[in-house]
A protein has these predicted regions:
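Loop-to-helix entry region of an early transmembrane alpha helix in multi-pass inner-membrane enzymes
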Residues: 65, 69, 79-101, 120, ...
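Short acidic/glycine- and proline-prone juxtamembrane loop motifs at membrane-interface regions
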Residues: 40, 64, 131-144, 183
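Membrane-lumen/periplasm interface segments of specific transmembrane helices
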Residues: 25, 205-296, 316-331, 379-393
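Membrane-interface alpha helices of multi-pass inner-membrane proteins
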Residues: 122-123, 166-181, 191-193, 213-219
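Extracytoplasmic catalytic/substrate-binding loops of multi-pass membrane glycan-assembly enzymes
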Residues: 32-46, 58-74, 82, 459-463
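Transmembrane-helix motifs of polytopic, lipid-linked glycan transferases
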Residues: 90-113, 151, 155
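Perimembrane helix-loop-helix junctions
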Residues: 1-5, 158-165, 186-216, 282-306, ...
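Transmembrane-helix signature of polytopic, membrane-embedded enzymes
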Residues: 12, 103-128, 147, 165, ...
Length: 716
């Protein structure tokens, strides 16, 4: 008796323990993510949250604020970007926890005859679908959308047995999906159709009325209440909000001609191909199971009436198909110049996948996956004959596309072959081995997605956070900071605006022209306009810069406050042109074969690049690289300065041509005939090279350094 009671208690509390364990693991997986990297998406939601918490800013946008309300407590509680970002990841992990708990509720309610072991396996499998695991490390709203869609589904099912008024509350939570993201309009429409069907069947015509009044009411509240209130808090410069969502009707302009129709077909193929291979066909098993339940031919009794299953099928099926259609229309466009993930975008529709996947796993047999292959082949064929080229890929938008990390360069047919293989293996492995195999494939995607995310976030921190960190270190909170938004004339430059928006959430960061800044802003001014210095000679001074683009200026009258941070001996011309210095500590991040010692970067007896990078922007002109080093044996040490990822060489010499015994500083001159955006200073050494690098600096050559340039200056 005691044993049975203990087992009953264990089974009752196990779902919560299971959810807590998985949520903790997800938090640990994302712990090393240094910060937001996808701007302005992540930055837009963070800026909303800061404004909600009382930090008025100038970053109003089209991004909806439902998710931002959830992460706003991070800005209430903490006062540094690092601690806020950590708290955002904690909140995301809590949302993931709710997602797993919701999956358990659905299993217990809809599949009461399934064994506990199968319930556990199914919940674990769906919980490890890559999208919600990796989204817990971003400040994208999809982790919130997926969780609240599950909660919406739960109250939808619970309302079957409650009074008519309960549908009012179903409408409220469904409407909140629109607060999280504009695609939330689709579940509202799908819910209205499903509830109307129930009302018709039961002759309870007030059901859809209750649902629609509350859903539309909360939608209108956001559109005409929350949105204007938030916009007022986020336009402190007086300029209009920077809106980016396209008018949906404009998308149809692409379908007026032959190329537009071909693009549409290709994007249909790409989207269907991704969602099929990404879920290993489980999404189609889910839709098939919904159809079977609706026709009362399912093998699994669930305790629900057929008409209730039909309402569920309408809600889930229309939500899935509607969002997929919107995604296809949004990204269909020119046949060239698009990213790969735009051809097969998954992040939107994956927000409604969880209940469909769960129903597919428990409502059908894995062997049925074999019938999914023709769908994938047809979709891949459409994609293959349309996709001629693409620019690059944002892998987090196709989080379950494991082929990206192994077979990207091999093309669609290789992706198709790999997808078919894993689906066939999953179909012919009996449970639980088939389920375990699917989990392994999901984890493979998660592992490589996390590897990409962590390394990319640290690269962003090194390359784009310099200005924001400098301002926080040298100017008090609340200081006005001007940003020359007009000079941010492309996407790559606009990301810095959102970077600063997060890093300076408690400053008065404003979109200002140079003239407006002089009149109304007491703090520094950031611009990409390199001509500012010559136009304002004698008035302003450069004090910091982004490693790649953009310079931070102050007035001469403020110079005394930050004089200790002037770069390169206070040479403003060199500073503005892009001169820089790299210490051996910094070079360690750009070394293949070096080892950091107490005072330098030392060769290790291996051949390879002792240093490379750092991919900086440098203006056209005459320069030289001054290297401080100690040479025991030069060997075959080749020094060059390149750009375009090594495609263009500006100087290529042997260190031995410039070095003489007893010297510890060499200077190598070179010229740039035009601006470069990714300059690399490289030293490739052989196995017999024995040397230590202390630092190097890129400086303007006013004619005093010629080839070969030797110096006997001591290391200082």
């Amino acid at each position: 008796m005691i044993h049975k009671e203990f087992r009953f208690t264990l089974i009752k509390v196990f779902p919560l323990v299971h959810a807590l364990f998985l949520a903790f693991c997800v938090f640990l997986l994302n712990y090393q993510v240094a910060g937001p990297m996808i701007q302005g998406d992540e930055g837009g939601y963070l800026a909303n949250a800061a404004a909600i918490a009382g930090f008025h800013n100038d970053l109003a946008s089209s991004y909806h604020a439902g998710y931002s309300f959830l992460i706003a407590p991070a800005f209430y509680i903490f006062d540094t970007p690092q601690s806020i970002w950590l708290t955002v990841k904690v909140i995301n992990s809590a949302l993931y926890l709710l997602l797993v708990v919701a999956l358990w509720w659905i299993v217990k309610r809809l599949f009461i005859s399934i064994s506990f072991q199968k319930q556990f396996s199914a919940v674990t499998l769906v919980s490890l679908y890559p999208m919600w695991v990796i989204m817990a490390g971003y400040s994208f709203p999809q982790i919130a959308f997926a969780t609240f869609f599950l909660l919406t589904f739960i109250v939808f099912v619970k309302a079957f047995s409650l009074k008519n008024i309960s549908w009012f509350f179903v409408g409220l939570i469904t409407g909140f999906l629109y607060w999280i993201h504009p695609i939330g309009i689709v579940p509202i429409i799908a819910g209205s159709i499903a509830v109307s069907y129930l009302g018709f069947i039961h002759r309870r015509y007030s059901l859809p009325l209750f649902f629609m009044v509350s859903a539309l009411g909360i939608l209108i509240l956001y559109r005409y209440g929350i949105n204007p209130w938030l916009t007022e808090r986020m336009t402190i410069s007086g300029l209009k909000a920077d809106l980016h969502y396209q008018n949906a009707l404009r998308q149809f302009r692409f379908f007026y001609d032959y190329e537009g129709l071909i693009s549409l077909l290709g994007h249909i193929g790409g989207h269907v191909f991704y969602i099929t291979t990404g879920t290993l066909g489980l999404v189609w098993l889910g839709l098939l199971s919904l159809l079977q339940q609706s026709l009362n031919v399912s093998r699994n009794p669930t305790g629900l009436e057929v008409h209730e299953w039909r309402a569920i099928s309408l809600f889930l099926g229309l939500s899935f198909l509607g969002i997929e259609a919107i995604s296809i229309l949004m990204f269909s466009g020119p046949l060239t110049g698009q990213r790969l993930d735009h051809w097969m975008y998954g992040r939107y529709v994956e927000g409604v996948l969880a209940p469909i996947l769960l129903i597919g796993i428990l409502g059908s047999r894995l062997k049925n996956l074999i019938w999914i292959i023709p769908i994938m082949v047809a979709a891949a064929t459409l994609l293959a004959f349309t996709l001629k080229s693409y620019t690059h890929t944002a892998p987090f938008n196709i989080s379950a596309f494991f082929q990206y990390f192994f077979l990207e360069n091999l093309g669609v047919w290789a992706w198709l072959a790999a997808g078919c293989v894993v689906i066939v293996v999953a179909a012919f492995l009996k449970a639980p081995f088939g389920w375990a195999f699917i989990i392994v494939i999901f984890w493979l995607s998660i592992f490589f997605q996390q590897k990409y995310h962590i390394s990319s976030s640290y690269a962003v921190e090194r390359s784009r956070w310099v200005i924001g960190q400098f301002i926080r270190q040298n100017f008090p909170r609340g200081t006005c900071v001007g940003f020359d938004y007009i000079s941010a004339d492309n996407y790559n430059r606009k990301v810095y605006w959102h970077d600063l928006g997060f890093l300076l959430f408690d400053y008065k960061l404003k979109r200002l022209t140079y003239e407006q800044w002089l009149k109304s802003c007491e703090g520094p001014f950031f611009t990409f306009d390199r001509e500012i210095g010559s136009r304002a000679a004698g008035k302003i001074y450069p004090i910091s810069r982004n490693p790649i683009e953009g310079i931070l200026w102050i007035r001469y009258s403020d110079f005394k406050d930050v004089s200790g941070f002037i770069d390169l001996a206070g040479d403003p011309t060199c500073f503005v042109n892009g001169c820089f210095e790299m210490s051996y500590i910094e070079l360690a991040s750009f070394s293949k074969v070096g080892r950091v010692t107490d005072n330098g970067l030392k060769s290790t007896g291996a051949s390879g690049y002792l240093f490379f990078g750092p991919y900086r922007r440098v203006e056209a002109g005459d320069y030289y690289v001054e290297i401080k080093l100690e040479v025991s044996a030069a060997g075959k040490a080749n020094f060059d300065v390149v750009s375009e990822r090594g495609g263009k060489k500006h100087i290529d010499v042997q260190i031995s041509d410039y070095f003489q015994a007893g010297q510890n500083v060499i200077r190598v001159p070179f010229s740039l005939d035009k601006q470069v955006t990714d300059i690399e200073v490289r030293l490739y050494i052989s196995k017999d090279s024995a040397l230590t690098i202390y630092s190097y600096a890129l400086k303007i050559n006013d004619g005093g350094v010629n080839a070969p340039g030797l110096s006997k200056s001591p290391i200082d």
